[in-house]
Amino acid sequence: MSEECTHDCSNCSAACSSRDAAPQHDAPNPNSSVKKVIGVVSGKGGVGKSMTSALLACAMARRGYHCGILDADITGPSIPKLFGIHGRAMADDKGCWPIQSRMGIDVMSINLLVENEEDPVVWRGPVIAGAVKQFWTDVVWKDVDFLFVDMPPGTGDVPLTVFQSLPVDGIVVVASPQELVSMIVAKAVNMAEMMKVPMLGIVENMSYIVCPDCGNHINVFGNSHVDEVAAKHHLPVLAKCPIDPKLAELSDAGMIETYGGEFLEGAADACEKLLKK
C-alpha cells in the first residue's frame, strides 16, 4: 500500500493488494433497464416507511420520471393496498411483469403473486431473502428511471440481501421524532456504511400535526431530535412530514396517488441529483 493511499478505491486506478473487491451484484432480468435504485429503510416498524416509498415514487412520477416500487417487505406488504392494486402479476417467456398504477408506476409485491392477499407469508428468512432477490432477477423492470425498494424494518436478512444483490445507488432513512430514533437511525446508518451504500438523508415522518383551527404545528410526539441525529451522522434532513388525516384516508382507499402534499420535494431533489451525476 502506498503512503499516499487515501483508502478511496473508487477513485484510484492503482493495482494494489489492499484494493477492496468490487461488489458482485446479481444481474437483473435481461429485459430490464433500471437507471437508479433507491432503498427506503427504517430501523423500526410503524414509522411510515411504505407510505414514504409510495409518495416519493409519486413525486418523481410527477416530475416525468418512470418509477417502480419493489416491495421487499415480504411478510408485511402494503404497497399494492396504497395504490389500490389487487390484480395478479403475469409472466411470460421474458419474465414476470409488474402491475402499473394509475400514474404508470410499476409495482411488484408478494401480494400480487398469492391467491388471496390476506394469506400470511409464513416463510423462513432465507426463503424470504430469495424471493426479494427474484423480484430483481426475474421481474422485468422496463425503462425505469428510479426503482424504489421498500424494505422491511431493521437490519436483518432482507436489507442485507438487497445491499448485496442490488446495485443500490442511495438510501433514504425514515424515522419518527422520538428520542429513541437516535439509536435506531444509527443502526441503519452503520449498516449502510458497512455495506458501502451511500446515504441520501433522513425523512422524519409524523413530525407534527397542523391544528385545523389556528394552523399551528403541534408536536404530538414531543420535540423532534432528527436535526441533531442528522448532524451527528453528517446527513441532510430531506423532509419533515406531518400527520395528515387526509393522507391516511386516501391510503386506506388505495388512492395515495391523488394526495397533493409536497413535503417530500427535498427527498425528490436528492434522488434527481443521482440521475444527473
Residue ranges and their predicted role:
Residues H66-C67, A72-E117, V122, A129:
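Phosphate-binding loop that captures ATP/GTP phosphates
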Residues K142-V149, T155-G156, P167-A188:
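Conserved Switch II/interswitch segment of TRAFAC-class P-loop GTPases
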Residues N31, K36-I74, V189:
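Walker A/P-loop phosphate-binding motif and the immediately C-terminal alpha-helix
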Residues K49-A54, P77-P80, M151-P159, L180-I184:
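Short glycine/serine/threonine-rich phosphate/pyrophosphate-binding segments
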Residues M1-H25, V189-K277:
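C-terminal lobe/tail of nucleotide-utilizing enzymes
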Residues M108, V132, M151, Q164, ...:
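Glycine-rich phosphate-binding loops of nucleotide-dependent enzymes
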Residues V34, G45, D71, I79, ...:
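Residue-level signature of catalytic and energy-coupling elements of molecular machines
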Residues V114-V162:
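Phosphate-binding/switch loop-helix module in NTP-utilizing enzymes
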